[in-house]
Each structure stands twice: as structure tokens, then as C-alpha cells.
Amino acid sequence: MFKLLSTANPKIQKGTDKGYLSFILHLAPADVAGYNTCPKATAGCKAACLNTAGRGGMFKRGETTNVIQKARIRKTKYFFENRSAFLDDLTADIMKAVNFARKRGLKPVFRLNGTSDLAWEKYGIIDQFPTIQFYDYTKILGRKIAHLPNYHLTFSAADGNDADVAEALAQGMNVAVVYDKIPEGVYSADEDDLRFLDPEVGIVGLKAKGKAKKDTSGFVRRTIPILVDKQAA
């Protein structure tokens, strides 16, 4: 139905209980496709990237890729190598998605950086839909989105970007922090993907999932002591 967008994400589907249907664009992260889609990527976030979560991480025996990964690489190359056609297709997808959601009595919302961190405010897409909500996570400070009241950004904490986190908080942004266990009193961002609905609480918590559970880079903030095998040490 859609050339570029999808809704096949369990967490995104939780938003339907609140009357929203999220559509997401998944590109290949970092430099996986030969183009850098995550200019502020860190070693920790690369290792724990949700690019290989769910079906994206299901590989047949002996294989290192699958149809999901191939599709994300193909879309990424399309974006960088035929930008105008890509943006035309994305615009058409958004229009279809708006109609799809509204026919089902839901509000369409869009996250264009499902597994990337591109400055979508530069490409004239969000401007075309001023009454539609867009939202993303980002590690890039200082993005110019004041002219786009329908675009919400949540800053992402990672290994080695504590100074940027402090600046983002000073600018009034919410910051998503991945924990092994979300501390008591920290607002949980795990209930849905609708970050634009979050109260302005500063820190919003996400629980480590998949590969992130084994992170030792500092990407995942530890609230539970790591047990060390003394015999292996």
C-alpha cells in the first residue's frame, strides 16, 4: 500500500488506544547503506540500534541480511541518489496515510526517523502538512524547527553526549534516556511512541531492549549493579 512508510511496530500500535495511528519511515542507520543517516551516532547506539529489532533482526541460518534490511538500504540509497523522486513518493505516502487513518477514525502522525537522524525540516515535507503532527528522536542539537509547530523533537541521550544532554535540557527539550530499569519517579516513555504528548518533565525513560540489555558503553544507564563473574575476571 505504501512505498516508503509502515505501521508494523508493536509500540507504535499502542498509540491507537489514544486515538492516533503512527506511520514510520525506516532507513538504514548510520553508514550501513554507504550514506550517513545518523551524524551523531555513537558506538553504543550503533550496537544497540533498533534496526535489528523484531523482523529486522530475523536472519536465515548462515545469512547476514534479510528482506527488511535490504528494503531499508534500498530506500536509503533512493533518498540520497534520487532525492526529488523520493520526496515525491514520501509526500504521496503521507497523503495516503492521512486518508487511511482518518477512515478508521484515527489521527495520523508521522515519525520519519524510525532508524535514522536526518534533519527533515530541510526537505519541505513537513511544511506541506501544517495540520499533521510529526515527531522524532534526535541527537542533533540546534535543529531549526521553530517555524514548524507541528514537528516535535525529543533529544536522545547516548554514550559520550552528556554535554549535549545538559544543553538540550537547558533549552527545554525532553531527553530520552535508556535504562536497564526505569528509576522510580522517571516518566516512562515505553507506554507508546507518542512523544509529542509527553509532559515537559525533562527526562523520559526507556527500558533497554534486545542487544541494549548487554550494553557496557554507557549508552544504557545502569540502575541495577552489573554482576561480575569473578572467575572470568
Positions of PLM-derived features:
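Class I S-adenosyl-L-methionine
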Residues: 1-233
